[in-house]
A protein has these predicted regions:
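Residue-level signal for short segments within beta-strands and strand-turn junctions
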Residues: 25, 38, 104, 122, ...
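Surface-exposed loop/turn and secondary-structure junction residues enriched for glycine/proline
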Residues: 32, 74, 224-227
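Conserved P-loop NTP-binding catalytic core
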Residues: 66-140
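Residues at beta-strand starts and edge strands
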Residues: 17, 30, 94-98, 112-114, ...
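Electropositive, glycine-dotted interaction segments
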Residues: 121-249
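Short, low-complexity, polar/charged sequence segments that are solvent-exposed and flexible
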Residues: 39-43, 73, 118-122, 177-181
Length: 249
């Protein structure tokens, strides 16, 4: 992570808080929305951490939310989501949708709002993938005939910043013809060279196969950094990645 953050950037890192979370067709939650009080008004920079509690009756979705946070942490930290979460898609649904809104407050008083959303489904493992997954299992372990992994797709990153009048989509991976859209933002963040375009396509496929985030995987962020590590969009991405790796849990 230090390779992605310059010394100048390190001097103005924000306090990051989750402001809102939306879960759709995730486990027993058809639609769930949580708004955190800490995001409703300005909290002075570098103040003590907020203490929030979630309460509700059995089956109200508390555990589902914690599991959604765990998935979020894995994705934003650039790690693979465990296959244990493959069963989180609601019964009878093809995929789940999760959305998280973040409040970023900086030392200089600037406040930005970032949104990261994605879809989650499950995919049956091939025989080779099953053998690879359980290659270190004890001899007496019974390897299952079938198993599943998590598939992450349709990632979307948008941002409201000090010079923007409204939320703007920065990265949308739902396109089949391009690694991500809008094209203007892709060229600004990653450059327009053919080699970069091929590398982005490879990363997108790798992320899909390995249950990772295309946006937050190190391979993608390094491409962005090589193009320009001082763009606002790149810096917010690495700030969110730092938050996930060190402060989310």
């Amino acid at each position: 992570m230090n390779k992605l953050i310059t010394s100048e950037h390190a001097e103005n890192l924000p306090t990051v808080r989750i402001k809102k979370a939306i879960l759709k067709d995730f486990k027993n939650v058809g639609y769930g929305e949580i708004i955190f009080n800490c995001g409703r008004q300005f909290v002075p920079y570098n103040t003590e951490a907020d203490i929030l509690g979630i309460y509700g009756q059995n089956g109200s979705g508390k555990t589902s939310f914690i599991e959604a946070l765990s998935i979020l942490q894995d994705l934003m930290a650039g790690a693979a989501v465990s296959g244990a979460y493959a069963d989180c898609v609601a019964i009878g649904k093809k995929f789940s949708e999760l959305e998280f809104i973040f409040d970023l407050q900086y030392k200089n008083g600037i406040i930005r709002e970032a949104t990261y959303s994605f879809c989650l489904s499950r995919k049956k493992l091939s025989e080779d993938e099953i053998h690879e997954k359980y290659k270190d299992a004890p001899d007496d372990f019974e390897i299952p005939d079938e198993d599943y992994k998590v598939v992450v797709f349709n990632e979307r990153f948008s941002l409201i910043w000090e010079n923007a009048s409204k939320r703007q989509v920065i990265i949308d991976t739902s396109s089949k013809e391009s690694p991500f859209i809008p094209t203007t933002k892709r060229k600004e963040i990653a450059g327009s060279g053919k080699k970069t375009l091929v590398s982005l396509e490879v990363n997108k496929q790798l992320a899909y196969e390995k249950s990772r985030s295309f946006i937050f995987m190190m391979e993608t962020l390094q491409l962005f950094a090589e193009n320009d590590n001082k763009t606002l969009f790149f810096q917010v991405l690495v700030e969110l990645r730092l938050f996930a790796r060190n402060y989310l849990f």
